[in-house]
């Protein structure tokens, strides 16, 4: 099949955009990966020419400036919930994913265990932490926050964010990824930006994703096929007439609510007027044959 997607252009734009945003950030730049870190089987199916190693190449290109944080919810670990289509237990999947990231990228990820209830979970979580520390992983704790993200006064107090570990990011950029639902990737970014600010580091946030495509309407076959793949993620038009998905819109609202009054005026966050402003997604500009991609997306919807 003829290539419909310029993978080199896509990779170049993503890398340069991340570098540009990092240069505009005085502290650390936290880059949330909205889907899987290393592969995207959906993109491969509907974007002929999409390089399966795109994200790997991006990470390797930025390697000297990059740390990776892997987030997982404490409840998923304790219950050892099944992950992936093969129902691999959480702890086993976590071990495999961490090892694979390190093997593929040469970067040893930090492990961030989130949503810990210390009154009920601490002994079990402590033992899990020890097992990963014996494999030379740095392990960090984020505690349960009741009524997050609505209890702003509590979150911005000594009993809120300051109870969590402040992860010492040594590089300029931190990629934030995770496994399982409710992994608290966004929360991890917010905790870090807030705590960085309190010690004089003016850090910021962006999200990196391949889909949905904001320059196409919600009902476009490409966006609908992606929504089906993500189990009916809600797509709609925002106040600016751009496609937005529910998760990204919620993230945008939370970031603006919790960090707007914290960060300085020249922070990237202060310049985000809509969800798409905080998202790196050059997919549309790299599609060379939109008609053919539409056909593949429609086929995906029919299956």
Description of each model-found segment:
Residues 1-175, 192-303:
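Flexible phosphate-sensing "switch/lid" loops adjacent to ATP/NTP-binding sites
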Residues 177-179:
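Residues at the beta-strand->loop junction immediately N-terminal to the Walker
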Residues 187-188:
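Hydrophobic positions on the alpha1 helix immediately C-terminal to the Walker A/P-loop
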Residues 181-183:
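Walker A (P-loop) phosphate-binding loop of P-loop NTPases
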